[in-house]
Amino acid sequence: SVVSAHAAENVIEEVVVTAGSSIQQRLGGSGSGTVLTAKEIQQVGATHASEALNRVAGVWVNRGSGQEHLTAIRSAVLTGSGACGEFSYLQDGIPIRPHGFCNINNLFELNTEQAAAVEVWRGPASAVLGGNALHGAINVITPVPDRSVIALEAGAYEFGRISLQGGVEQGSHRLGATFVGANSGGYRDDSGYGQQKLSLSHLTEVSGWAVRSHVTATLLNQETGGYVRGEKAYEDSDLRTTNPNPEAYRDAWSLRLNSEWSRDAWTLKPYIRRSQMAFLQHFLPGQPLEENDQSSIGMIVERGLSTAT
């Protein structure tokens, strides 16, 4: 009926974000923050993180070939080593790279497509989040679905995507899973990509501690498009779809395990991180092949301070 349809439109979706997963409470008034809700993220249906993040004031994520990008948060668009340490990318309040390690394209390792929320922090945050947050930070909150959803999409240039999510609750345990897989032939010659992201979540209570645990894995296999060169090349419509570097590629995977134990004013967040990438640097003389990887383990300990008088 019209009444029930109107009522459904006015239902406000509730998204629960714990204090431990969020960076807003930790940063306080040191900058300016914006939160993209799950509803906003779903409405955008972004095929690249830039399509959602560029809705945030003071943010510009410049899309490169495939899933590559360059980020600006109240700053210039920084490239190469100049972008290292400028922005911190986090999942559930935990940086996805150790301090001092950098990949300026890190957003493709975060499941922004199915996030419970995405927090964007504008302004210096290195004192709280570590040395990788000179200009700001982007934090993705992992969802724990309570219902099953299957979505299929198709688009131009051989684009296809499948999104799955589901959850189950048994006693004091709640389990959730999300998966998104996308393939594209690319707008230009030999510039397609295949990308998959999987998250598994578990919520429970242990001796008075509220426990949230997540396992996240990502995989990207990308054929990279090189720069089209030539005077006024932009005026030649035939050049727009060409790729002068069909040999260029970027293959990357990541695996993260993290947990959040909260009780009273205390929050403990142990984590394990592993990532590996190989990509042909077609933009440099000699086209060197870069291969990098990192493994790290740690724990963040937080204690809230009461301001009551």
Q: Where are the predicted features?
A:
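Short strand-turn segments of transmembrane beta-barrel domains in outer membranes
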Residues: 86, 124-125, 136-137, 142-168, ...
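Transmembrane beta-strands of outer-membrane beta-barrel pores
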Residues: 154-158, 168-172, 181-185, 206-208, ...
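Short acidic/polar hinge/loop motifs at secondary-structure boundaries
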Residues: 94-122, 140-141
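Non-catalytic regulatory/gating segments with a bias toward low-complexity or hydrophobic composition
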Residues: 41, 53, 118-119, 138
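Flexible loop and strand-edge segments within Gram-negative outer membrane beta-barrel domains
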Residues: 184-191, 195, 210-258, 275-293
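Short, acidic, small-residue-rich periplasmic hinge/interaction motif at the N-terminus
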Residues: 6-42
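Hydrophobic, lipid-facing positions within transmembrane beta-strands of outer-membrane proteins
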Residues: 13, 69, 134-136, 150, ...
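Extracytoplasmic beta-strand/coil segments of soluble accessory domains associated
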Residues: 50-94
